[in-house]
């Protein structure tokens, strides 16, 4: 229909399942604007045992993000840095669908800044998370939302809202 192959949600789900198959803890994250008009974006968070944190990976834009020293950043860290006007660096070869080179100014400062108002993901990261077939229950979701905001009652409403960044981004090995 859009003459561009699969959308960002499907690409993120495929990458998520690849990470899971390789033994990495991973989840696909829907990045939402404050007011949903017709656009959001879905990327991945993959857990690094070495760095002890979730890392930003975007299969649609072949993108990852670092700080000014080259340290890989996670989605929560990028949100916080954008909010506080701290440096973020987009990988040099970031591009949309292997066609259009991306700039930090467009991808992070405009497009993703708009889509990072709140983030949501399934409570359980698993294969076929959103595949609909007889007898399968639709997954429960959790959202990280700003204080005073609720994702309930909105399209794709979640079961749980949290205002706690530490809880949302905690280690998958934490009990």
Name what the model sees in each region.
Residues 1-43:
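Active-site neighborhood of thiol-dependent amide/isopeptide-bond enzymes
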Residues 36-38, 47, 51-175:
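His-Asp-centered catalytic microenvironments across diverse enzyme cores
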């Amino acid at each position: 229909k859009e003459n561009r192959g699969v959308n960002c949600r499907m690409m993120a789900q495929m990458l998520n399942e690849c990470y899971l198959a390789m033994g990495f803890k991973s989840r696909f994250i829907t990045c939402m604007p404050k007011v949903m008009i017709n656009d959001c974006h879905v990327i991945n968070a993959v857990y690094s045992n070495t760095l002890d944190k979730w890392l930003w990976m975007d299969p649609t834009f072949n993108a990852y993000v670092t700080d000014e020293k080259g340290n890989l950043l996670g989605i929560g860290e990028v949100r916080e840095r954008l909010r506080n006007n701290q440096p973020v660096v987009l990988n040099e070869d970031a591009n949309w669908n292997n066609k259009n080179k991306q700039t930090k100014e467009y991808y992070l400062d405009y497009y993703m800044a708009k889509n990072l108002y709140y983030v949501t993901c399934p409570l359980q990261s698993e294969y076929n998370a959103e595949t609909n077939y007889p007898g399968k229950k639709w997954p429960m979701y959790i959202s990280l939302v700003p204080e005073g905001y609720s994702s309930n009652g909105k399209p794709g409403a979640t079961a749980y809202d949290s205002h706690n960044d530490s809880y949302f981004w905690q280690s998958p090995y934490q009990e």
